[in-house]
């Protein structure tokens, strides 16, 4: 199963980046840095702050936004600075464990022989459905199953073909999991008129409005 994407806003602190002599991590030096220090130093004192530790601390604070269930049980909203840049961080989960990070390549996944078959099956069949659900999760099926039947008729085969095609590129090449998701989004949302009357996304929108 795939975790929902979490948006994180980079820190607006300013300073000079240097390499820490003790832990070899990248360190920011400047005035007013209040992030946790490496090697157990106080979070309130000193000029150096380990960016790697701060990044992990920021991610942990937002981990409750990740959805690890097929059903949405709780929704959390994050408010960002209008002038800030939002970074999308995608993960793929298997049970309670993270199976793929944004930088994970297929060669890395093959090292875990216990779960590779399930991962391959998910990539070939369901990766596009997961992205679709993330993008259009506001669609609700009520009263009857007409929208669900409409989805099966117009979109299911199209999304399955995208999953198969993009997963082949991912498994044969040197792309990361983030790049795979970019391919899926690009293929899924294109409206290039491959079928009569417009692309599949246009057809789904038109059918949804007229249903």
UniProtKB/Swiss-Prot annotation:
Name of the protein in its database record: UPF0329 protein ECU07_1880/ECU10_0020
Organism: Encephalitozoon cuniculi (strain GB-M1)
Family affiliation: Belongs to the UPF0329 family.
